[in-house]
Amino acid sequence: MLFLALFLFACGESDPDTNHDGDENGEDKEEELVFVSLDEARLSGFELYEPTEGSAARLAFDAGITSYLDKITKVAHHIDERYEGEEGFTFDLAEGPQCMRGDDFSVSIRDRGSKDLLLFLQGGGACWSDFCLAVTKAPTNMPRPLVLDPELEANPYASFNAVYFPYCDGSLFAGDNIVPEDDPAKLEKGLTERVYRGLANLSAGLVVAKARFEDPERVVLAGSSAGGYGTILAAFLVRYVYPDAELIIVNDAGVGVAKDGEVEFVEKLLTEFGAERFVPEDCAECFVNGHITPLIDYFLERDPNARAAAITSWYDYIISELFMEIDKDDFADALDIETTKLHEKFPDRYRRFIYWGEKGTGHTALLGNPSGLIGTGPIAVEMPGGVNVAGLLNNLELLKFNELSIGEITLAAWLGAMVENDLDAWGDLMVPREPEEDGDGG
């Protein structure tokens, strides 16, 4: 029923011209925004700096992805009265951040008085000229997927300060481009362009994060689905913003596998999103195998104070068959090869949790409910024609990290061990590609 609810929720609001007001329970409502200076919102502007040559923080500076950090000067600020310590910030469209169809972009924070910080990148599809299934609005309040639930005892990040980054521009948090719309059905509705502002949105959220949580000891950068893919480039910018923190990257269902041998696919996405210029000059060969995983290699090699987790099912239906349109066995082959290379090169800093679930096609394990993919409040989801509805409903499975286990350890406990850098408990765990009879399929 969860999967049916997710699909119906998306389809019910798939018209990008449709807005839904909130209700008495505190959901978001359309209202006129009142912008104030950062000072009035108890924030401060970001001051760009030039990092030391050869430092990990220098990577983002040299790649040119820091350009939006000092552009944010005003926000519309609101306090979520339902939950203590939670606030939201909406940004001025003129300063860069926005959703794909021109709606406002917002982030939410939770202050728990912690020395640790969770940055969570929401999932929600992707949109390019050949395929578009994407969320196109950003909620102003923080949802409650498992990873953001401060009351869930098993949540290893429950006590962390948190920043929630909605996802609404279809560019995997990497875009910086405006592309003319080429879908006749959307042109008929007056939608003439796709605005990719993932980098500006990510930057705006990090400005808020830095202002409120200036010097955390540990930063967990986590993302699910599109947010998982988003962590790959976001890690560079997060390191620039927090040069001294332990950086713990948790990639859930967006581990960097794409189309094996099809470099043109990756290049097309980068070009359309306007992100090709952010690829480091000495990483020009990073995508020759058709995957994005070499960029993870590039980053970890240059940032010894970062470690990363790859969490996925063997046959993730949403990534393999829906978005990549590749055979699930080809996906599993590439997943095995690409992640093995990373683990063998960084055995203590890159580890996997590859599970089976009920069907082996599960998608995401940090969420447990759809709010981590589509947010809450006014939602707009653009759906492509010809989607295999039966396949989607039959294969979509949102796992729960407090219940999913391999052997004796749950994913939640495994992630807790990762935070503590307990290399014994944070093992490299993979179930067989086909579950054994009466065995633990994860």
What is each of the regions a protein language model found here?
Residues 8-10:
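C-terminal motif of bacterial Sec signal peptides marking the signal peptidase cleavage site
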Residues 22-24:
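Extracellular calcium-associated, cysteine-rich motifs in secreted modular proteins
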Residues 12-17, 26-442:
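C-terminal His-loop and adjacent cap/lid subdomain of alpha/beta-hydrolase
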Residues 1-4:
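Sec-dependent signal peptide recognition
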